[in-house]
Amino acid sequence: MIRYFILLLYIIFFSSCASKLSKTLKSTDSDYKLKVAENYYAQKKYDKAQVLFEDLFPILKGTPKFEDLYYKYAYSAYYLGDYSNAENLFKTFVETFPTSNKAEEADFMRATCYYRQSPKAELDQTNTTKAMGQMQAFINTHPQSPKVAEATKIIDESRAKLEVKDFKSAELYYNLGFYKAAAIAFTALIDNYPDSNKGDEYKLMVIKSYYLYANNSIEEKQAERYDKVIAECTDFLDRFPESKLVKTVEYYRTESSNNIKSKDEQNKKAA
């Protein structure tokens, strides 16, 4: 019985809320409508505030009140998690009110919307790339902004996510046995993320990939491909002389050199 009573109270409460919004929408008093909308916004009832803000567009457009209304309308979309729409609204705000004291904030929020849409590393990273581009554009446009540090942090986090994405792609080639493609992909990782603290790990994967590529090649191609492994090992030792992976690299260099010598001896005997 108590459960039904509570359910009835919920129904009455939500019906009352819906009724208030409906009555406000029908009102011809724009000041009253705006006041209700701002109350909804202050109470974080962004879905209701959004409806009223949108209804006030044709009435307040061109008036001093329109800037603040549009600003809150954009934030309503953002707080509701509608980041794609919010991005477009913040962009339009900057274009419509370029001299506003809120324009810088809106510009930052536009970039933030792309960042919020950035998915897991395994998925398409278009929005991650856009977030980086927009944040860099924000830094270039507003170099003295207090938001520069946060924008820089987001760029770094986004770049790290792209690095993980590219690593997983390279790793997949390796796990599937496409060793030449893996070697090329791991080389690209090193080139694209020169400041990564995993550079020596990526380089070792280049070496291992080329080694397995040589090992699985036809006999006529093996010597030149082991030479490639040796060249990559030498490059590793030049770049990362203090790496904990040096012994592993020296193993692959020695193995490749021994394989070449073995092939040469076999060829001499065959001759």
Where are the regions a protein language model picked out?
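Sec-dependent bacterial lipoprotein signal peptides
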Residues: 1-17
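Acidic, polar-rich low-complexity tracts and alpha-helical solenoid repeat scaffolds
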Residues: 16-271
